[in-house]
């Protein structure tokens, strides 16, 4: 299960979910080709109905999602920096193979790439150029930049930013920013914004929120001994507060809830579970400011209906 993987996963990890409008043009082209080759007029009518259905759904509802797991290099304390790059590559490759093995055991399909460097460059380009990347692939952008620098006689000094950075970035507004012609707003779920009890699969609400809604989960594993010590101290402090507080006081329920939560975490650690901090970042994108405001309001309503709070 995923719990077994979390026991041996890196200390810091990011799970990124990117949702964007699905490209159904290739599928529609195949249907049109089938209509042209079909001899039976009745079958042509059925194929045409199917074509219109796919086109109608694609314009409104078709969304494609990509799931990424991101690892950060964790240098070993006291290690030499002489071979730091080599050590980082080895550590990250081991983390990737381990994650791939455990995810496949859980029934997930993990996409493999012949050239990992090219794949990562394309992903970074897509994330920074959400709009341009749908029209100009990374290979075309890279070729154009190389050709430009060669023409200028400076082919050996091409910065990495020339291949990845968007042509337009505007951070002049507090409520949103504009990158590559798209409007972005960023929100988070504060520590008090989660439900106290959730069912399995509660994150599907965020993952399936719709086009233009990205979710980032940042996980950080804490040393078990450190957390056990902090929990024990905080439980003792809260129990002392309870003795000094009347059960009719409004603070009594909050303190009682904190004590019970502390014991819940303590029992989990005693049963060989690990303690993780999790931060949830939600990114909303749109083609216009009006559409961004509408998506933001709808997302806040959706979260509120599930007792979740969204903060900028």
Locate predicted features.
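Extended, folded cores of ATP/NTP-driven motor/assembly subunits in large transport
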Residues: 1-312
């Amino acid at each position: 299960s995923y719990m077994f993987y979390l026991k041996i996963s890196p200390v810091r990890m990011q799970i990124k979910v990117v949702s964007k409008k699905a490209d159904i043009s290739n599928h529609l082209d195949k249907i049109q080709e089938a209509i042209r080759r079909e001899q039976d007029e009745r079958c042509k009518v059925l194929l045409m109905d199917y074509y219109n259905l796919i086109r109608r759904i694609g314009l409104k509802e078709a969304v494609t999602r990509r799931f990424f797991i991101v690892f950060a290099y964790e240098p070993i304390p006291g290690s030499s920096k002489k071979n730091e790059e080599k050590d980082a590559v080895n550590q990250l490759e081991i983390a990737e193979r381990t994650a791939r093995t455990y995810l496949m055991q859980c029934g997930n399909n993990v996409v493999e790439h012949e050239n990992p460097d090219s794949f990562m460059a394309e992903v970074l380009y897509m994330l920074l150029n959400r709009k341009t990347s749908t029209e100009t692939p990374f290979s075309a952008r890279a070729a154009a930049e190389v050709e430009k620098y060669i023409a200028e006689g400076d082919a050996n000094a091409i910065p990495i930013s020339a291949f990845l950075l968007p042509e337009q970035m505007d951070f002049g507004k507090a409520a949103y920013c504009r990158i590559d012609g798209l409007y972005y707003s960023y929100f988070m779920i504060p520590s008090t914004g989660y439900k106290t009890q959730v069912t399995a699969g509660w994150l599907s609400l965020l993952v399936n929120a719709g086009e233009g809604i990205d979710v980032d989960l940042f996980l950080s594993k804490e040393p078990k001994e450190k957390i056990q010590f902090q929990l024990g101290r905080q439980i003792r402090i809260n129990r002392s507060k309870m003795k000094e507080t009347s059960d009719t006081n409004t603070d009594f329920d909050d303190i009682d809830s904190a004590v019970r939560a502390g014991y819940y975490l303590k029992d989990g650690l005693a049963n060989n579970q690990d303690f993780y901090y999790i931060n949830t970042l939600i990114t909303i994108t749109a083609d216009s400011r009006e559409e961004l405001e509408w998506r933001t309001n709808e997302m806040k309503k959706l979260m509120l209906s599930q007792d979740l709070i969204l903060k900028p």
